[in-house]
């Protein structure tokens, strides 16, 4: 719904299947030792394919995921190239003894949105140096502190959201910034729930993630105007399905000269 309301595309990729029949991203779990799947290469190639196939913005591509997907977010930020502009890991962490190669030495500062439950008993907020299942992993504070320092942020604004459900699971936001106009901010949202997106009912975390990403969306619509077009063949939506023209949606206009016009009619 947030994508429909704000006119951006969302892709939900699936990782490969492990020996137990579960889909996963290869982030360095102990029980995946020896797995050589290159998920960084896969996701960056997928992003490039979607950008070129559907004329999506190369400069406004972001990455988020929960749990294993959150850990993939961290891995991409440290070891990936510059395909993704900002990251939003949810209930994730980093496994320093796993496959990561550029821990604390990423290519460039990037904006970071982190959300994690203080009562998460799957991926503990404080980390675990001797986990017998996943492998040792870092605390949320360690990772947030790194990105705050790496991004040269010195200002902190703390807000506590109203406890709308009166359940004591208050969400608190910590927003790190600097006086520079182009600073790569780091936001941390903590809640009193467990290993989830933050289901305390006080905020919609997906909306907060989009609010953060949209801060770094340059030329957000990036509509490529074509001066001279031939005959229109058909119109498709983001999924390649033929549709009729409608308002407030990304549509692709296919012409008989091979060109495609991406357009949004706003009403």
PLM region descriptions:
Residues 1-62, 66, 72-75, 79:
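Serine-hydrolase catalytic machinery in alpha/beta-hydrolase-like enzymes
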Residues 8-14, 26, 60-65, 71-76, ...:
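Structural recognition of the beta-strand scaffold that forms the well-ordered cores
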Residues 15-20, 118-121, 150-155, 193-194, ...:
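Acidic glycine-/aspartate-rich tracts in secreted/extracellular proteins
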Residues 85-169, 174-181:
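The feature captures the conserved acid-bearing segment of alpha/beta-hydrolase catalytic domains
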Residues 154, 215-242:
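Residue-level detector of functionally pivotal "anchor" positions at catalytic/ligand-binding pockets or at interdomain
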Residues 202-219:
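Catalytic active-site module of serine/aspartate enzymes centered on a nucleophile-bearing elbow/loop
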């Amino acid at each position: 719904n947030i994508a429909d309301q704000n006119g951006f595309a969302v892709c939900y990729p699936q990782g490969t299947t492990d020996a137990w029949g579960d889909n996963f991203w290869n982030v360095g779990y102990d029980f995946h030792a020896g797995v050589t799947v290159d998920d960084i290469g896969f996701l960056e190639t997928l992003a490039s394919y979607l950008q070129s196939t559907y004329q999506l913005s190369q400069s406004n591509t972001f990455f988020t995921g929960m749990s294993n997907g959150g850990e993939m977010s961290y891995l991409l930020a440290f070891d990936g190239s510059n395909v993704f502009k900002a990251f939003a890991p949810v209930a994730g962490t980093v496994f320093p003894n796993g496959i990561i190669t550029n821990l604390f030495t990423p290519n460039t500062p990037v904006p970071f949105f982190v959300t994690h439950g203080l009562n998460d008993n799957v991926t503990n907020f404080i980390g675990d140096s001797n986990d017998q299942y996943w492998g040792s992993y870092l605390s949320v504070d360690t990772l947030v502190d790194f990105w705050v320092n790496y991004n040269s942020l010195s200002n902190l604004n703390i807000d506590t959201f109203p406890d709308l459900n009166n359940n004591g699971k208050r969400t608190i936001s910590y927003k790190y910034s600097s006086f520079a106009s182009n600073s790569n901010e780091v936001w941390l949202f903590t809640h009193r729930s467990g290993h989830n997106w933050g289901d305390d009912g006080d905020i919609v975390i997906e909306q907060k993630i989009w609010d953060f990403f949209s801060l770094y969306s340059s030329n957000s619509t990036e509509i490529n105007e074509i001066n001279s077009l031939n005959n229109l063949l058909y119109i498709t939506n983001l999924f390649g399905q033929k549709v009729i023209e409608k308002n407030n949606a990304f549509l692709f206009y296919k012409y008989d000269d091979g060109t495609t016009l991406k357009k949004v009619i706003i009403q």
